[in-house]
């Protein structure tokens, strides 16, 4: 995974409350056997009309927001079903971070584990940032992962990350990498465990041999 000490770029306003994962990635795009091509389905019913033509008024279809890499959204972003495709679609589209007052719990976990940064701020602070980025010339946002601060034209605010998620971004670790980084502690725990409970050691292999 990529190391992220800072995420910055143009932000697009998406002030929609309770935007669920079914809207972020509609069901017809879940039929693929791999992750490829999910950018096409991102927010499909918002980006395109019933005739399949782009809706020119939708923010991500506006030329001035074509380079957007950050979304500033309403509360409860990513609620609904647990489809991880919503995260993959956002990332394939080029979105690197979402700022909102709150997120769906499962979506938050999926996003952070896939290196999509989610920043939860007070609703008033998100409102200030939304006002900024509603003018394309004021839409540059900087998210400093190390200091856990976000900066727009009118606001600098702090946000919280768990130490595990912060480390994953700063060191470019996925879940497997984060686990492997704790190998010494895992081996030490295992050694203590087997010393205290020797009758459990290799119980799986002994059971297998007995049943063979």
From Swiss-Prot:
Classification via Pfam families: Aconitase_C
A GO molecular-function annotation: 3-isopropylmalate dehydratase activity
Record keyword Transcription present: no
Pathway: Amino-acid biosynthesis; L-leucine biosynthesis; L-leucine from 3-methyl-2-oxobutanoate: step 2/4
Keywords: Amino-acid biosynthesis, Branched-chain amino acid biosynthesis, Leucine biosynthesis, Lyase
Catalysed transformations (reactions): (2R,3S)-3-isopropylmalate = (2S)-2-isopropylmalate
Cellular component GO terms held in the UniProt record: 3-isopropylmalate dehydratase complex
One biological process term in Gene Ontology: L-leucine biosynthetic process
EC number(s) per entry: 4.2.1.33
NCBIfam families recorded: leuD, PRK01641.1
Subunit structure: Heterodimer of LeuC and LeuD.
The family this protein is said to belong to: Belongs to the LeuD family. LeuD type 1 subfamily.
Biological role stated in the UniProt entry: Catalyzes the isomerization between 2-isopropylmalate and 3-isopropylmalate, via the formation of 2-isopropylmaleate.
Name under which the protein is recorded: 3-isopropylmalate dehydratase small subunit 1
The gene coding this protein: leuD1
């Amino acid at each position: 995974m990529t190391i992220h000490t800072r995420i910055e770029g143009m932000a697009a306003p998406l002030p929609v409350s309770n935007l669920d994962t079914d809207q972020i990635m509609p069901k017809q795009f879940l039929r693929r056997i791999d992750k490829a091509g999910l950018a096409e389905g991102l927010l499909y019913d918002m980006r395109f009309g019933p005739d399949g033509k782009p809706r020119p008024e939708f923010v991500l279809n506006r030329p001035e927001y074509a380079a957007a890499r950050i979304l500033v959204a309403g509360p409860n972003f990513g609620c609904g079903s647990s489809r991880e495709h919503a995260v993959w679609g956002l990332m394939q589209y080029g979105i690197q971070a979402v700022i909102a007052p709150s997120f769906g719990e499962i979506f938050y976990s999926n996003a952070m584990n896939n290196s999509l940064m989610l920043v939860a701020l007070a609703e008033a602070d998100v409102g200030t940032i939304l006002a900024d980025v509603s003018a394309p010339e004021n839409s540059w946002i900087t998210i400093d992962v190390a200091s856990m601060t976000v900066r727009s034209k009118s606001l600098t605010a702090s946000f919280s990350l768990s130490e595990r998620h912060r480390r994953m971004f700063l060191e470019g670790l996925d879940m497997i990498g984060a686990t492997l980084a704790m190998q010494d502690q895992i081996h030490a725990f295992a050694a203590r465990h087997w010393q205290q409970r020797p009758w459990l050691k290799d119980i799986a292999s002994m059971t297998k041999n007995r049943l063979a």
